[in-house]
Amino acid sequence: MFKIIKQLTSVVAMFAVLFAFSTETMAAKKSKTLENTKKRGFVRCGVSQGLPGFSNADESGNWTGIDVDVCRAVAAATLGDATKVKFTPLSAKERFTALTSGEIDILSRNTTWTLSRDADIGLTFVGVNFYDGQGFMVRKGSGIGSTSEFKNGTSVCTNLGTTTELNMRDFFDSK
């Protein structure tokens, strides 16, 4: 019995040490982002493009929307100037690579917060600023009133690499 307790204690101690080092490394990486942003003098902010109300550039290159406002708030808080932002338009496919590679400092665009993104990619979500839902649009004259009326071979479109795609696959796989 004593031998088992000793082995368990060793395993727990090993995990505690590994956790301490990994937490220290994550904290160091996060502080480097802030440190590098301050040295650079501007925040590199990843946004979507052409999504009025969220992030959209006009013909003159002036950005507007709630996601843009978040970027400006971060610049004001960290650099003392809300105009110290460089916006980088990113697709759903590009957004996480740009963030994890350090191409951008923060990501402020339509992105669903999921457990797998939190755990697997290692992202830190700061909070939800918009709640949405999902549904299907069909032509008015199609006669389709619900998804139960979809026939085999019905075409459905969505953006690849999004939570919407995964939810749609789950929905149809369950039928």
Where are these regions (language model features)?
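N-terminal hydrophobic or amphipathic helices and topogenic motifs
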Residues: 2-11, 15, 20-86
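Short low-complexity, flexible loop/linker segments enriched in glycine and/or proline
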Residues: 61, 122-124, 173
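Acidic, polar ligand-binding/catalytic clefts
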Residues: 72, 76, 84-150
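Bilobed "Venus flytrap"/periplasmic-binding protein-like clamshell domains
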Residues: 44-53, 63-78, 112, 132-175
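Short, flexible helix/strand-to-coil boundary loops that buttress conserved ligand/catalytic motifs
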Residues: 58, 118, 172
